[in-house]
UniProtKB/Swiss-Prot annotation:
Protein function: Part of the Sec protein translocase complex. Interacts with the SecYEG preprotein conducting channel. Has a central role in coupling the hydrolysis of ATP to the transfer of proteins into and across the cell membrane, serving both as a receptor for the preprotein-SecB complex and as an ATP-driven molecular motor driving the stepwise translocation of polypeptide chains across the membrane.
UniProt enzyme class: translocase
Subunit structure: Monomer and homodimer. Part of the essential Sec protein translocation apparatus which comprises SecA, SecYEG and auxiliary proteins SecDF-YajC and YidC.
EC number: 7.4.2.8
Names of the cofactor(s): Zn(2+)
The protein's name in its UniProt record: Protein translocase subunit SecA
HAMAP family: SecA (MF_01382)
Binding positions (Zn(2+)): 885, 887, 896-897
Compositionally biased residues, Basic residues: 891-901
Binding positions for ATP per the UniProt entry: 87, 105-109, 512
Record note on cofactor: May bind 1 zinc ion per subunit.
Organism whose genome encodes this protein: Enterobacter sp. (strain 638)
InterPro entries: Helicase_ATP-bd (IPR014001), Helicase_C-like (IPR001650), P-loop_NTPase (IPR027417), SEC_C_motif (IPR004027), SecA (IPR000185), SecA_CS (IPR020937), SecA_DEAD (IPR011115), SecA_motor_DEAD (IPR014018)
Amino acid sequence: MLIKLLTKVFGSRNDRTLRRMRKAVTVINAMEPEMEKLSDDELKAKTVEFRARLDKGETVESLIPEAFAVVREASKRVFGMRHFDVQLLGGMVLNERCIAEMRTGEGKTLTATLPAYLNALSGKGVHVVTVNDYLAQRDAENNRPLFEFLGMSVGINMSGLPAPAKREAYGADITYGTNNEYGFDYLRDNMAFSPEERVQRKLHYALVDEVDSILIDEARTPLIISGPAEDSSDMYRKVDKIIPHLIRQEKEDSDTFQGEGHFSVDEKARQVNLTERGLIQIEELLVEQGIMEEGESLYSPTNIMLMHHVTAALRAHALFTRDVDYIVKDGEVIIVDEHTGRTMQGRRWSDGLHQAVEAKEGVDIQNENQTLASITFQNYFRLYEKLAGMTGTADTEAFEFSSIYKLDTVVVPTNRPMIRKDMPDLVYMTEAEKIQAIIEDIRERTAAGQPVLVGTISIEKSEVVSHELEKAGIKHNVLNAKFHAKEADIVAQAGYPAAVTIATNMAGRGTDIVLGGSWQSELAELENPTPEQIAQVKADWQVRHDAVLASGGLHIIGTERHESRRIDNQLRGRAGRQGDAGSSRFYLSMEDALMRIFASDRVSGMMRKLGMKPGEAIEHPWVTKAIANAQRKVESRNFDIRKQLLEYDDVANDQRRAIYTQRNELLDVTDVSETINSIREDVFKATIDAYIPPQSLEEMWDVEGLQERLKNDFDLELPVKEWLDKEPELHEETLRERILENAIEVYKRKEEVVGTEMMRHFEKGVMLQTLDSLWKEHLAAMDYLRQGIHLRGYAQKDPKQEYKRESFAMFATMLESLKYEVISTLGKVQVRMPEEVEAMEQQRREEAERLAQMQQLSHQTDENEAAEAIAAQTGDRKVGRNDPCPCGSGKKYKSCHGRLS
């Protein structure tokens, strides 16, 4: 109550921010007459003037009023479009490291030109980040005339571009590209073998479009570049044949309960667990198939990999559904993004899950992958000096933006008042009743000439609705991952009178639905249209536009609630753009996933008791409140998972930055001989100390062992025993010096054979190759450590602290191994001719190219590990003997981890 009163008196933080910025808008508006008087050349010259002022020490902030006024005037001349005052506000929000929430249709693309121009003046580059290649190309081409008019260059960073073209795109003042491509380029740059292979500059300013989709929805999926590991496809096929023999255990209170099954499914945590009966059954089947020996246990240490195959196969069958989580096209399993409904060509699930799904679908199984480099979007975007973003729906996630990215959210007012009518949800008992009600609603609205957009959460659901519409004889378009190429055309015409469009989730995001359809796309179909034809197309569009407005504008139908309120709001936001009329309604059933998992059984019980007749809907604030609570629960859980993922990745991030900094320094220098000499001294000291401990008696020395080690690991044949026999006065310090002197002498002779320049080149190549090889092994070791670390919770230890401690120890060991391996390799490799170094270099290049071609850009399912880690932290709470084991196995505690204690 008190907070509401204070907000009323002083205004919210959002109001105060906008009040401050409106003063600057007044200044920009006052400059407009002055800018209008400038000739085109004088307006263009302003860019050169601003850059000169920055060089003299002025700040970017001091240029805001004048720079924004210049961009607004240039936009009027190039596009015939003038930035509204609210767009100037949005531009200022984006310049202040904030998230700007701007409603659909408020011109986010034009707003972005203001901060992009302002921050590109420093010459350090601006990255505009979009969710797909189509939007990156569209926005770049649309804004190119404006930026080029102002003397700025524009680049497009597309996937699949060769390195020189990418370097050129990054060298531009303003670069457009997708979040994935920027992230993968960063990883690839840190795998380069020469400075010329790198494409990115220093990360200066990122302006993220649809920021909620990229920084929140995608934050659970790290970017991973991986290469092929050993082939185990045969095992996936064998294990896959066993899974259909297993029976899923239903809940005891369900109608289909038939006693204990073989495995249980936790839909909330996306986990599958074997029951006691299931373990016995699967062991018998594995023995029958000849995969496991009689009397062996699936949980024995020798069967760890087999357990991995069984778990992956169970998850593939029980949790992943064709046409919902993936599609099969041309004999290939392609992931469908759960957030956008788009197919993700080239992305693969990790942990053997993708191979298990391939075995299930009977397509060719591709090899498992080994991680070569990885980073989360959270850590990638925090590398930028300055980060900002815009979206139509950010306010529900403001806390997360603030706590993880240190970005405040500012809600920018609309240019015209919003008049869309959002109707309450209708809840039906069954899915079939709900679909029937949706069809009737569509029939009534299209009869009145009103366009309808139906939002579904999966390809499967969109095809069910499509099938029912076909039966009802209603013409419609389907927009889902299967028809990706036609996406923009379908969205452009979704505002036609009586048009019906079915869209998966947020497909078509970033393209406005114009009431009456898009006259631009009609013109694009005409070859060299005459002025009369253009006028006719526009006149026809105006008639259609007015007819749609009269019928009530675009109507949105949601076929079920999404896990996140934000994505529901995005669907609603497709209607009512720029003050147009519009309406929306969600249709739900008690069989929907969200209702089934989170809304309690009491709701369905209550509906049955009320004596609801088939086809009847319930519309009550209690139900709406129950749904909102369920969504809040899911959002809170997903936030915990993302936060957990980030806390673990922060540990790896510190190590990644240290390695990448070291690697880039190594790439930029030509002579690493000083470093080699320094680490040679460290390596030989440690090696000699292992056989001749400091300040020890001669009886404790293992001279023969030392001689053998020097010969085997460094190809150094030194008569250490002979020296000691002939010179009794030799003590450990002088002996160490003599061994080192001999090692340096042998190395110098090797250098004389190939020449100094070639040797420096060779040293650098060996260091890079060794660093990459050990870093790759370290990443795999970190993955294994991560998978089991949550079990430390049973020992009352904090898994995160344990992970930090152990991974640091592993990192320190890796650095020591790096020194040893480099000196050992340089000592053992016999180089007799300069051509041999060239040949080795060529071989390394070919191997790097081969790996690059086989690299996978994969989509990791880290949320499961994070969920496990959350679940395993039991603290001091005592687990009862008959309680379910906290590890999620489905067994009682006494039969699982309780037995161990």
